[in-house]
Amino acid sequence: ASIIHPTSIVGPNDFKPGLPMQAFVDMANGKRKLMPNWGYNFIDVRDLCDAAISAVENGKTGQNYIIGGDYHMYLYIGELIGEKLGRKVVYGALPEFITYLPLPFEYIRALITNKPRVLTLDAIHTAQTGNKVVPSSLAREELGHNPRPIEETIYDTIEFFQKRGLVK
């Protein structure tokens, strides 16, 4: 068996949005007009599925594969969401120290609403210290991993959420 290690998984057909996807929904609905000045390496779930199938069919036994896309800033993701919706949804970057202030309130909100926290200390730490260059070259070479452009992922994702009524 081969082992795959995806980066931050995003994309359409997410019927119960997790942390990154809920952030996209919130941006689209105007709930997050300012975003932190950081990002993540995002991988489209459809590309991850293709890589997983290829790992079963072509992967080397015991080999680990990093399945990543490209690093993108949340500000850019907000621009893409705005393009898809035909309106501006993100207006600028938050100073880094301010990102810590809502943590206790986010925790309480999650307890009351029984919904996952969109912002966690771990998410802040990962975004601040995470490697912006994630090497997926082995997966590209041995599994034929070829992630689609983030623009396609975001447009398809927002369209999916619109159809589900999560994005107005």
Where are these regions (language model features)?
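Low-complexity, charge- and small-residue-enriched intrinsically disordered regions
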Residues: 33-41, 105-131
